[in-house]
Amino acid sequence: MIFRRVARGVFPMFGDGKTTYHPLYIDNLVDAFIAAMQLDVGNGEAYLIADENYVEIEKLVKAVAAALGVDVSIPHYPLFPLVAAGHVCETLCKPFGVTPPIFPRRVDWYRQNRAFDIRKAKRDLGYRPLVGLTEGLARTASWYRSEGYLPLPDIASASVR
């Protein structure tokens, strides 16, 4: 979980951090579903639903840190050893029915670009993502804290910032 790792203050970045990620805040997804249902369009059609813009993963990590109100160190490491470790772990764990701690799909977060074109949803459904990245991350951080997934902010240190 990105938020938990960032909250610890260090987020290891494998590769250059320029891989793109296209976030989607849940309210935006729900809005798209409601629009499709109310307009009764798109039967049998596929739509890509995402927030307005994609973001490089290092910038996403920094935005999560801002939403949490914490400083984060982002040391960079070469990607290849992680890719190799993912394949080795998966190969060794699979025969024993053990979920590997690292596997190729998890490593892909650092290396596969995910940037989508939402124009079709905008055109056909009138889709407009209303909650932007900064607000969505702030709401997510608040929810994680209220549900106990993240510690509450330290009031004393927060006031010093």
Write out the residue ranges for each language-model feature:
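NAD(P)-dependent short-chain dehydrogenase/reductase
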Residues: 1-31, 35, 64
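Short, hinge-like loop/turn segments at secondary-structure boundaries
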Residues: 1-4, 91-94, 148
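Residues at helix-coil transition
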Residues: 7-8, 38, 69, 145-146
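Low-complexity, charge- and small-residue-enriched intrinsically disordered regions
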Residues: 10-15, 20-26, 90-114
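Conserved loop-to-helix N-cap of the C-terminal "lid" that shapes the substrate pocket in Rossmann-like
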Residues: 17-30, 46, 54-58, 115, ...
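Mid/C-terminal beta-alpha module of Rossmann-like enzyme folds, strongest
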Residues: 35, 39-102, 118, 138-139, ...
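Amphipathic terminal alpha-helices
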Residues: 120-122, 128, 132-161
